[in-house]
Amino acid sequence: MGKTFVYRFDQGHKDMRDLLGGKGANLAEMTAIGLPVPQGFTITTEACNDYYEKDGQVSSLVLDQIDQALLELEKVQGKVLGSDDNPLLVSVRSGAVFSMPGMMDTILNLGLNDKSVLGLASSTQNERFAYDSYRRFIQMFSDVAMEIPKYKFEAVLDRIKEAKGYQSDTDLTTDDLMAIVAEYKSIYQSEMGKAFPQDPREQLLLAIKAVFRSWNNPRARIYRQLNDISDQLGTAVTIQSMVFGNMGADSGTGVAFTRNPATGEAVLFGEYLINAQGEDVVAGIRTPQSIATLEKEMPAIYDEFIAITQLLEKHYRDMQDVEFTIEKGKLYMLQTRNGKRTAKAAIKIAVDSVKEGLISKEEAILRIEPSQLDQLLHPTFDSKACQEALCLAKGLPASPGAASGRVYFHAEDVVAHAKQGEPCLLVRQETSPEDIEGMVKATGILTARGGMTSHAAVVARGMGKTCVAGCSQLRVNEAAKTVDVDGRQIHEGDYLSIDGSTGRVYLGELAMTSVTVDDTYTTFMSWVDEARDMLVRTNADNPRDAQKGIDFGAEGIGLCRTEHMFFEEDRIPAVREMILADGLDDRLKALDKLLPFQRQDFYEIFKVLNGRACTIRLLDPPLHEFLPHEEKAIKDLAEQLGYPLDYLHKRIADLEEFNPMLGHRGCRLAITYPEIYQMQVKAIAQGAIKALQEGYEVRPEIMVPLISSAKELAMLRLLIEQTMQEELTAADQELAYTIGTMIEIPRACVTADDIAQYADFFSFGTNDLTQMGFGFSRDDAGKFLGEYVDRGIFDKDPFQTFDQKGIGRLFSTAVALGRLAKPELKLGICGEHGGDPAAIAFCHSQGLTYVSCSPFRVPLARLAAAQAAIKASGYSLTQDK
């Protein structure tokens, strides 16, 4: 006996999703537990894959099994497909393993033709109903299976309704419907070059093939790519005998959720229509009634429906989204599936389900997608406002949240207008460190260039600012203060709105929905913290971000970038003076001006942390990044420092590098200019001493960036220890501190055993490690990475999703060698991947001590770390069933 490609509903169960798809498996399960389900059968996902292997042909084996299942269905129903006496009608639905948009829509009433419509009219004693069903079928079949534009049919309907003064489809008479059927068949003949198929088996085969084809349509393929769903799964096809909600006042159809999908409240939520078919509810042609009113209209049906929905929720142990039809006073369940819900509802349902004894805490934790917490903790646009707004362009969703504001193209303009209370969007080709003040004051940031790890993206995430980056459809003219997009020109002061969670850019100002956390969220996150065994720190460069990270549950700072402290308006002149200094004496004078600023910064951060660890990265970027690039700013600097303009131009040119990311930066600056790191270490020591003397606990971890050789770290460790000791001795103070390094160069990974001899900890800088491991410049990779993903060379952009196969091997090598040389070595990650759930799971598997991410991603990282720990313990969702 060959493979089984077709299963009756009474032959399957809910754990056969891979074979029967979500829809087919759930219909089989509802049948098994005795619910009133119109019977039918499911053609498996394997039949879909077989169809593609046979170049778009349904094999004879599959056809034979369909015919056999159809015969059995006809016997059960006491009706025959295509009969002109008492015809069997069926619906055809796609049913992938995972629910996804883009798959083929439902076809209802399949089996109707010029003869069987008479049989339907006779058997139901309702001619109008029969022709209404026929016109619906022709339109659906033509649109969904044969891809004839829907508007061609809608135009006929609208014309007749307008001519006769009808308000609703229900006003159409039998004669009207007969005329519409005739016109619909003419449209089909004209579009397809042949008559509308009258053989029900031909109709069925065409519909099945259309479902299989829809598996590979562009929308479905893109959705699978975005959601990591395999192209090899295929879709099932569900064939189900029709029940009719449009047979009069004792019939109807509706959709309901067993809990409120927006809030999670444990009340039935849904709507229905009397005398209607399923698509009427979705199409919005008539206004549905709340499910609560069904209790008055049909009390017995309502009581039965309540009992069924409660049974389904207990059975599936999750909120269900159900479709139902009432035919002549009898209730039928057409579908159930786990309902989609907002982040707020997801957490409430998970917590309530634990309290109700439906699931365990572990399952509650595994049920919440970490990315949902991003949605919960950032403001979002009102969903209706988004639907009504004009979307101008789409870039990269670089930092989540929603922001509306007036467009300004220069940081100083943002600062000036923000002071007057205006909401401002900073719009740039790409941002640079000079824009930092404008970025702080802006409600959101929009750039035409740059990727998910560009300057704008990284800084925005750190500040919790909404950012859309790399929006290549924008033509930004910073000089003219205009941006051209989609045939429009936006001027300075015009309103735009950006959605950092989707990357969409909208015209005008959109209404927003703010989200606040409640006791349910607090309870859920307490379970998360109980479950995880890996620490979560935050990346923070100032006391404000440090406090924000702690408020979100961070257990310290995993990356404090000292260079970000240099860009404040009152200190950048001293930084530039230090960089442009002629010799050591001038450089030391400039550094003396910077020391008090850095000392105060560290003191303030240590106070906020009060005993929590603080990993401080010493100066990393190349010096030219701190210098101005626009002519006006260069002239102002020349006047400020008393330098001739020509001399200043020459000094700036001398500091320019062909490849600055691989140039004179990081520890290399300290080897050539040790006084820079000496000043920073003094500031750390003095800030720590002041905090200690005021009764605070201090735990500094000093981190040296860009180490590629153990000798570099040996030399700089000595410099740091000597400088620290001088300061501590002078103050007669003791302080426990550690010294470590960033692991961000491939050579450092493969010589980690040597480097570990001089390090108390390693922190993986995955941005640079990815950049150097692939040989990509992350600022230029946006030009080709999209194409790499589209063509299947990469599954994902490696700057967004950690590359476990390649960069992960370098990472694993460094972990193994480092711990071999020094078993007590602490390990962390502080690159942008520190907030990526897949990367966090990988870090857990490698035994890392902590992950560190931007403040707003801390809750996400806490949840991802808990999920990794639960899965590593061998727990699976099936244990709760």
Regions found by a protein language model. Give the residues of each.
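Short alpha-helix capping/helix-loop boundary micro-motifs
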Residues: 311, 480-486
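Conserved alpha/beta-domain cores
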Residues: 93-94, 517, 527-881
